[in-house]
């Protein structure tokens, strides 16, 4: 059985890894959708699809998990989004998502939809991790070591800090 899991992975963290490890015990292959792949260089989506692909693939090299990582664009027409996903991915029968819109769209197309249990959401939240990066707090323990290396390679911390700067002083 092949399943689809979509996320923004901004950044890929240990909570994501635990969800993927759990799903991998239930299915033969996982299609990891890199959602909102067209978005980058913002405070909520600082990393490019390619950078997120590196985070995921470099991390999963260390695990016996069969997967495909595929960039998935947002489109402005929800009724055809599932068809767009289907055109970009190998066939799958099951969708794992915690997003109510994604759950509804795939349910309407008769997919089996499962809601994965979040792993320690208190600590493992992309929003909280990005905030820690911005503030200079410790964040490295919340992501796999391979993700730390990717973020260092792309100078991701300084990118986030530059993105938070105002263009002009406000009086």
Curated annotation (Swiss-Prot):
Q: Looking at the keywords, is Nucleotidyltransferase present?
A: yes
Protein name as catalogued:
Nicotinamide-nucleotide adenylyltransferase
Q: Name one Pfam family in it.
A: CTP_transf_like
Q: In which pathway does it act?
A: Cofactor biosynthesis; NAD(+) biosynthesis; NAD(+) from nicotinamide D-ribonucleotide: step 1/1
Q: Where in the cell is it found?
A: Cytoplasm
Protein source organism: Methanococcus maripaludis (strain C7 / ATCC BAA-1331)
Family of this protein: Belongs to the archaeal NMN adenylyltransferase family.
- EC numbers: 2.7.7.1
- Which EC main class describes this enzyme? transferase
> Reaction catalysed?
beta-nicotinamide D-ribonucleotide + ATP + H(+) = diphosphate + NAD(+)
**Where is the organism placed in the taxonomic lineage, from the top?**
Archaea, Methanobacteriati, Methanobacteriota, Methanomada group, Methanococci
Q: Which domain of life is it from?
A: Archaea
Q: Which GO terms fall under biological process for this protein?
A: NAD biosynthetic process
């Amino acid at each position: 059985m092949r399943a689809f899991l979509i996320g923004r992975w901004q950044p890929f963290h240990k909570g994501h890894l635990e969800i993927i490890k759990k799903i991998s015990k239930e299915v033969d292959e996982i299609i990891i959708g890199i959602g909102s792949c067209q978005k980058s260089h913002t405070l909520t989506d600082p990393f490019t699809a390619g950078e997120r692909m590196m985070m995921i693939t470099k991390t999963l090299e260390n695990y016996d998990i069969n997967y495909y990582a595929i960039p998935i664009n947002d489109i402005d027409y929800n009724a055809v989004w599932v068809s767009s996903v289907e055109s970009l991915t190998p066939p799958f029968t099951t969708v794992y998502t915690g997003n109510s819109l994604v759950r509804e769209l795939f349910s309407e197309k008769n997919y089996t939809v499962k809601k994965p249990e979040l792993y320690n959401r208190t600590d493992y939240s992309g929003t909280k991790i990005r905030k820690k990066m911005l503030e200079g707090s410790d964040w490295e323990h919340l992501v796999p070591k391979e993700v730390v290396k990717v973020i260092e390679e792309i100078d991701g911390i300084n990118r986030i800090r530059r993105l938070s700067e105002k263009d002009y002083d406000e009086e």
